[in-house]
């Protein structure tokens, strides 16, 4: 027999506060509205989000989808009690995976799960998601907030993101004409981005430093703040370069697995990327991680971006035009190497020179 009357249980007694959920929705509505774009101008709160491809200017589009998370970088945000930027990371990890296929990000949805919903914390997280969406030019058209007592400890949370983009048919990347001798350009990262943070946290533990300690590699910043520097969003500069020059043959987002795992994903089997490690300008954060953790260069390269967040492949005659277009949008461009012939069974990424860590 179910309980009734004044002693009956409520959902709140079980740890789920519907009123807090409703309060969060009201808090985030202005941030969500700020992401509206052609094709998406609805309000959140419906059973699903809508997007009008024709209103967005597409005629014969191919849809491209990606989903990702932020990983254990969230643990630093939780422990440091700084939640404003992890939403940017969430968007970046998804939309950067869209643009490498030549697609314009159109809309984004998030999943936010927590042990106990704190509206101000949730609003900070979603505010970051909205900021990332604005930077990428995509609309935040919906999401799910799940308060899950017993699944997560109070204060803990996890994030997942889902992005959909589009490219006109025939405009997808990589192109089919990547050739031996093509030049490999690298775009600078903003820091560690959102990969390798289990190793980062282990190194910080070994260092004995707290998240509020001065960052040894970033003057004027606390350690937690410096490590939480959000992932760079490359969407608008790359889309502009694609449209202005028509010369980009391939793009690779340097995430987990670094150069050796990510670059070969966009190459034909008969070609490999030869990277001059001496050309990589390694930011101080990576030097500190390598030195403090005793991490060898090979392990750094397969775990972190080491200062290069995006790879661009172009024909040699187009290097100047593509570099100029990207630099005009604020990107730091460096020539990293060339495409070379690859023997059957050989690695898709090979190195020359030494990584200066």
Curated annotation (Swiss-Prot):
| EC number(s) given by UniProt | 6.3.3.1
The record, for Pfam families, names: AIRS, AIRS_C
Q: Which UniProt keywords apply?
A: ATP-binding, Cytoplasm, Ligase, Nucleotide-binding, Purine biosynthesis
CDD domains, A to Z: PurM
Please list the reactions this protein catalyses.
2-formamido-N(1)-(5-O-phospho-beta-D-ribosyl)acetamidine + ATP = 5-amino-1-(5-phospho-beta-D-ribosyl)imidazole + ADP + phosphate + H(+)
Highest taxon in the source lineage: Bacteria
GO CC terms of this entry: cytosol
| Gene Ontology BP, a term | 'de novo' IMP biosynthetic process
Please tell me where this protein is predominantly located. cytoplasm
SUPFAM superfamilies membership:
PurM C-terminal domain-like, PurM N-terminal domain-like
Its pathway, per UniProt, is:
Purine metabolism; IMP biosynthesis via de novo pathway; 5-amino-1-(5-phospho-D-ribosyl)imidazole from N(2)-formyl-N(1)-(5-phospho-D-ribosyl)glycinamide: step 2/2
GO MF terms listed in the record are: ATP binding; phosphoribosylamine-glycine ligase activity; phosphoribosylformylglycinamidine cyclo-ligase activity
Subcellular location, record wording: Cytoplasm
Q: Which family does it belong to?
A: Belongs to the AIR synthase family.
Please name the HAMAP family in this protein's record: AIRS (MF_00741)
What PANTHER family does UniProt report for this protein, alphabetically? TRIFUNCTIONAL PURINE BIOSYNTHETIC PROTEIN ADENOSINE-3 (PTHR10520:SF12), TRIFUNCTIONAL PURINE BIOSYNTHETIC PROTEIN ADENOSINE-3-RELATED (PTHR10520)
What is the name listed in the Swiss-Prot or TrEMBL entry for this protein?
Phosphoribosylformylglycinamidine cyclo-ligase
